Structure formats: structure tokens, C-alpha cells
Amino acid sequence: MATYFVGDIQGCNDELQQLLALAQFNPQHDELWLTGDLVARGPKSLDVLRFVYGLGDRATTVLGNHDLNLLAVDAGYSQAKKKDKTENILTAPDRHELMTWLRTQPIMAEHPTLPVMMTHAGLSPQWDLATARHCAREVEMLLRSDQGNWLLGHMYGEEPSHWDARLTGLPRWRYIINSFTRMRFCRNDGSLEFKCKEAPSDKPALLAPWFEVRQAAPDEPHLVFGHWAALMGKCPLPTIKALDTGCVWGNQLTLWRWDDNAMFSLNCPAYASGGE
């Protein structure tokens, strides 16, 4: 059995299937971990959802910002954007089944036997691992509760940008969601900044990538994340793996096999523009 991790797919199902074939992924025996943003901007988001859902316990995915937005649209709290190309999900006969499944996915996942964990955007520099775990479980439970629709309708916004353990209610939950699904850069004080989406080489002087600010404990598991296509898979820290390489932007879809550290990439020239 092998364990694979794949970056943001964003509806690029044909490319996903080609990449899995290239790596000789076997759904009968292997595990597939996905960094979130299964949907939006690519042409076959419905096919991606059906494929991952059909893998059952052979697949583990985390929620990304585009996945959460789709859930908000499904719940009637947001309008579908034409550029997201998710209209056929909303009219599919298995819409309810797929959306119910998607809503139950975690925003932070840890492998039960391997020293590796996964989120969509990373881990806040203002959290230790115990805090991150607690915050993830808190929001996951809320999304699955009777308050889930309300949260999906009110999660949008960039404040607060600074963590405080005394935060309660919507400000607390918004910070948690933003940290797990939207974060890229931080200011000098560790607060989150959401405007800049460039590569670190093009950032303003007062910003730093979250992974350069966060002080991880020596015994923390490896961390896999996606979301930040401008990184093109480049992260200087050996225990952090960046896997979003901008498939939907016309760049690449990238797959990493944990067992032997093998990397597999597929060029995706069919897409000239894509998602966040």
C-alpha cells in the first residue's frame, strides 16, 4: 500500500486521472490524500467530487476555500459564479449526497499511522499544534451542526487577522476558517494578510510566508498543504510540502508519494486562467 498526496484539483478531473495513472495509483490498495479545493474554475468539478466520494475510505480530503464557497452556494447563502463552473453540481441528481459528504470533511487531517498531517492553506503562526487541532475540531463540528448553514453564510471577511484565545463566536470561527483555508502571508506581528497572492520573491517587504514565521515544535508531523499556486511547490522547509502547482492556471498538477518521496507532475496547458 502506498500513500499519495495531490495538490488542488479545482475541477481538472481529466488531469487528475492521467496523473494517477502515471503514478500507478491503485484504488484497491493505495491511499489518496487531497489538499482541498476539489472544485471550481476547472470544467469537471462534479466528476472530481464523484470520484473522490467513490473512493470511500481510500481517500482523505480537507476543505479548501472553494469547497466552502460551494457549500455556501448549496445552502443558499452565496451566489454561484459563472467562472466557477459548478452549475451542474447544483442540478445533479446526487447533489444532496455529495454536498452532505463534502460538509463532513475535515479542515485538518492527520494520518493515523504516518507522521504527516494536511490542511488546505497551512497552520497559523499564532497556533501551536494542540491549538490547531482544537480549533479544527471546533469548526468541523459547527459545520455539521444546525448552525452550519449560518456559519457558511457569515464566514466571509478578513477580520480578525490576529488570534486571541479569548475570541468567541463568529470572529473566532472566521479566524479559524481563514487560517486553514485562505492564509498565505503574515505581517511582522504574525497577523494574517490576505491581499497578496504572489510568490514570496515578489512580496512586500513587511510580509513573510506563514511557514517562515511559524515556529514548529521539533516533534511535529510533516505538513502537506495546497492553496498557494504561486509557490509552484517550492517551500524551503524539509518537513513542509507545498503541492498546489497551479493546474487550473495552466501550470501543473502535482502528486507526491510519501513512501519513497517520489514526485509526479502533469503539465496542464489546456488552462490559461483559473482559481484563487
UniProtKB/Swiss-Prot annotation:
A Pfam family assignment: Metallophos
Annotated InterPro entries: ApaH, Calcineurin-like_PHP_ApaH, Metallo-depent_PP-like
Family per similarity comment: Belongs to the Ap4A hydrolase family.
Keyword annotations of the record: Hydrolase
First-tier enzyme category under EC: hydrolase
Gene name tied to this protein: apaH
Membrane-traversing stretches: none
Species of the source: Tolumonas auensis (strain DSM 9187 / NBRC 110442 / TA 4)
Keyword Endoplasmic reticulum included in the entry's annotation: no
Function: Hydrolyzes diadenosine 5',5'''-P1,P4-tetraphosphate to yield ADP.
Classification via SUPFAM superfamilies: Metallo-dependent phosphatases (SSF56300)
Lineage: Bacteria, Pseudomonadati, Pseudomonadota, Gammaproteobacteria, Aeromonadales
Swiss-Prot/TrEMBL catalytic activity: P(1),P(4)-bis(5'-adenosyl) tetraphosphate + H2O = 2 ADP + 2 H(+)
Annotated GO MF terms: bis(5'-nucleosyl)-tetraphosphatase (symmetrical) activity
EC number: 3.6.1.41
Superkingdom field: Bacteria
Protein name as annotated: Bis(5'-nucleosyl)-tetraphosphatase, symmetrical
